[in-house]
Amino acid sequence: MALHAAAEFADKDLAAPLTIVATSDEESSMAGARHLVASGRPKADYAIIGEPTGLQPIYAHKGVSMMTVTVHGAAGHSSDPSLGNNALDTMHKVMGALISFRQELAEKHQHPGFTVNVPTLNLGCMRAGDNPNRICGHAELQIDLRLLPGMDSDAVHQQLEQRCQDAAAGSNTQLTVSTLYPPVPPFESPADGNLTKMLSELSDRTPGTVAFGTEAHFLQTLGMQTVVWGPGSIDQAHQPDEYLEHAHIQPAIDTLQKVIGRFCQA
């Protein structure tokens, strides 16, 4: 749709350049966007991050960190606990510490712009042991952490790891915390910015926020006024038979062409 909208201006003089960027690995590491930041380009005043927002301009979203907590114990026959060190026993304590940490984060941090107005910490997936009559020698827990704009991701990650280490102390097991991929930082831009206001007027939708992560932070780092906007719904994302409502296609093209005309034409 962006290409279709831009084609309208192929033979027209533009006072400001129009750039369409396609990035790699947007679903996980954001490697393409990180490379753009490292290379310092493209240079632009405004950026629209194409995401399924139902044509609603998004001025803020939460950060996303996915982490793995691993506990190494020692396996042995379950008939004699002294023969091993149970990794699941330690992980039980760690999970309790994470749940307490989640509550502390929610009590300290709120953002009125979000439907879920606190940071979230989800204990999403655990793998441990291999047999009920064997002391569990290894346990792995994967978690999803979503922080609000303004929160220091590095500081929270350090606090989380320290809570886990404290919970595991004295258990004769080894604990590590690692990231599945580099964290996606939170993003926030002025809700009354020029681009946000124009997209809001053209789409007849009030600016809002979302809890999923995007590349917006990285483009903003390059000095662009950045908005997340696009056709479709996140409800259909990551589902079998993803689809885009036909009713969104032409309005999206029309809106993009008006935005290009406003900011790029002489």
For each predicted feature, which ranges?
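Short, conserved clusters of charged catalytic residues that mark active-site
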Residues: 1, 31, 210-214
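Acidic/histidine-rich catalytic neighborhood of metal-dependent amide-processing enzymes
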Residues: 3-66
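Metal-dependent amide/peptide-bond hydrolase catalytic core
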Residues: 66-266
